[in-house]
Amino acid sequence: MQIITDPAEMQKIAEKLRLQHQYIGVVMTMGALHEGHLSLVKLAKEKAGTVIMSIFVNPTQFGPDEDFHRYPRPFEKDVALARSAGIDYLFAPTTEAMYPEGYSTSIDPGPVATRFEGASRPGHFGGMATVVVKLLGITRPHLAVFGEKDAQQLAIIRRVVTDLNIGTTILGAPIARESDGLATSSRNIYLSSDERQQATALYRAILYAGEQIEQGRADLEAIAAEAEELVLSEKDTQPDYLCFVDDATFERATKAVPGKAYRLIMAVRIGSTRLIDNWRFDYQ
């Protein structure tokens, strides 16, 4: 595995790989690697001959009250995990390399970026979309793999790549979960033992909603309210949002229509830690 920190060098390597007709896959991360990231790598390796991983804690997608400086950065451990996972190139630029003096360009992903995560974290998706486009330009991949856990992010990336004719295939990978259903996340390490137990309420809410849909209920607004009550039954839980959305547009959905895809999305604060989760389904 080769470690590269210079964007120009990474771009030069990627261009050479393309000339050699290598099919390139990329997995973009902010480090603090866990099983969720490794599942993305596994999928990328199944699809691509050469896999690049980026590790970059992007400051432009953190709000003023968020955990940029607190965000874990166990770089040596990440390098070991990336190497053992079979990564070919690890791209780990500095902030100064990605945003040099005079940098002024940013991407506005449109209305979908102002809902839910976008409403709770103003500016987050603009910063995310900008760095994703930069990383696509630097690594020149044919395929990029992103996790379904960040479902709104995935929808925005697909929109941006389509709108800007970037030509990279965007592949969503299933959510990796712990044995009790909690979605794997770099932020899980912030949870105390009590909070870790309380966090299982998110997955229990998903299971409850799934049971209701299986029974044929279409009243999504009522199901979401019941699922939220289940989350609130745990102490110190504060949902930012918990609702169903149209899976394509991320507009709030109140009643299911046969033949359409929907997603239950949620963001819940447990103590000082904010967790997200979701579940997608096709309504029959």
From Swiss-Prot:
One of its GO terms (molecular function) is pantoate-beta-alanine ligase activity. It is found in: Cytoplasm. It catalyses: (R)-pantoate + beta-alanine + ATP = (R)-pantothenate + AMP + diphosphate + H(+). ATP binds at residues 30-37, 147-150, 176, 184-187. Pathway: Cofactor biosynthesis; (R)-pantothenate biosynthesis; (R)-pantothenate from (R)-pantoate and beta-alanine: step 1/1. Disulfide bonds: none annotated. Keywords: ATP-binding, Cytoplasm, Ligase, Nucleotide-binding, Pantothenate biosynthesis. The keyword Plastid does not apply. GO terms for biological process: pantothenate biosynthetic process. The keyword Transferase does not apply. Its EC number is 6.3.2.1. The active site is at H37 (proton donor). This is Pantothenate synthetase. It comes from Chlorobaculum parvum (strain DSM 263 / NCIMB 8327). The gene is panC.
